[in-house]
A protein has these predicted regions:
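Terminal low-complexity tails and localization/encapsulation signals of metabolic enzymes
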Residues: 1-3, 244-257
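Helix-loop "lid/cap" segments that line or gate small-molecule binding pockets
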Residues: 158-159, 210-214, 228-234
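Hydrophobic alpha-helical membrane-association signature
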Residues: 32-35, 80-83, 185, 226
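Crotonase-fold acyl-CoA enzyme core
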Residues: 7, 89-204, 236, 241, ...
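A structural preference for short, pocket-lining loop segments at secondary-structure junctions
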Residues: 11-20, 31-72, 90-101, 119, ...
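Hydrophobic/aromatic residues within transmembrane alpha-helices
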Residues: 17, 53, 65, 113-115, ...
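A short acidic, glycine-rich active-site loop
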Residues: 71-83
Length: 257
């Protein structure tokens, strides 16, 4: 697929997706969303150990492109929103950890992207907002990701007021993992992703899958599911190698992906 609004590159063991529409504040048109979906599907099918979602310009993403939305019929609007939902679910479904590298403003579906990514690093000047609540179109779909990334009351505050929050608040509320000087965002993003992708690739993939599957279950069901997954995983070669290496006091030698 030829990309017009994004780029997909490889940096060592990481895949890097960069939104490249700064003149439109990286607004998410249907074509832009399709490119992002294709990129993450490609990453999921490939050998990269982790993925970075970054953006050019001073705005990470302004959310949906209203020029692309205006005048759409109900069926056309539904198709667009379902495409966006498919992208968000794909980011969490692929085996690799995905980290958002945020420098600037992330609003509406742009904030939804940050909330969806497994990890996020933000620059000190970054801001996060779901502004629909103070206008005429509530940010219902961004709320799905937001409510699963921060507390219920913090999510509803953002959704209902539409007020922006700064990077320090985003960190305190759990929307991002790290806040660093703007000049250090790229470095810290790669450092955190490096730590999040070390160890067995297959174990990490299973861990990510089971994390998202159990998180919305009630506690007994979550323990039942997690117990079965962990018990079965104990029989894999990488798990056995981990045990042997610990007992033999040596570094583990995990299988290659």
């Amino acid at each position: 697929m030829e990309y017009e609004y994004i780029s997909l590159a490889r940096e060592d063991e990481f895949a890097v997706v960069t939104m490249r529409r700064p003149e439109r504040r990286n607004a998410l048109s249907e074509a832009h969303l399709r490119e992002l979906l294709h990129a993450f599907e490609t990453i999921g099918a490939g050998p990269a150990r982790g993925a970075i979602l970054a953006a050019e310009g001073s705005v990470f993403s302004a959310g949906h492109d209203f020029a692309d939305m205006h005048g759409r019929r109900l069926d056309e609007m539904r198709r667009l929103l379902l495409l966006c939902a498919e992208l968000m679910q794909t980011i969490q479904a692929i085996a690799q950890p995905v980290i958002a590298q945020v420098a600037g403003l992330a609003t509406a579906a742009g904030c939804q992207l940050v909330a969806t990514c497994d990890l996020a690093v933000a620059g000190e000047s970054s801001r996060f907002q779901v502004p629909g609540g103070r206008g005429g179109w509530f940010c219902t779909t961004p709320g799905v990701a937001l409510a699963r990334a921060v507390s219920r009351k913090h999510a509803f505050e953002m959704l209902a007021t539409g007020d922006p929050i700064d990077a320090a608040t985003a960190l305190a509320w759990g929307l991002v993992n790290r806040v660093v000087a703007d000049a250090d965002v790229e470095r810290e993003t790669r450092a955190l992703l490096g730590r999040a992708t070390r160890g067995s690739v297959s174990s990490k993939a299973l861990g990510k899958q089971s994390f998202y599957r159990q998180i919305d279950l009630d506690v007994p069901a979550a323990y039942a599911y997690a117990t079965e997954v962990m018990a079965a995983a104990s029989q894999t070669e990488d798990a056995q190698e981990n045990l042997r290496a610990f007992l033999e006091k040596r570094p583990p030698r995990f299988s290659k992906p």
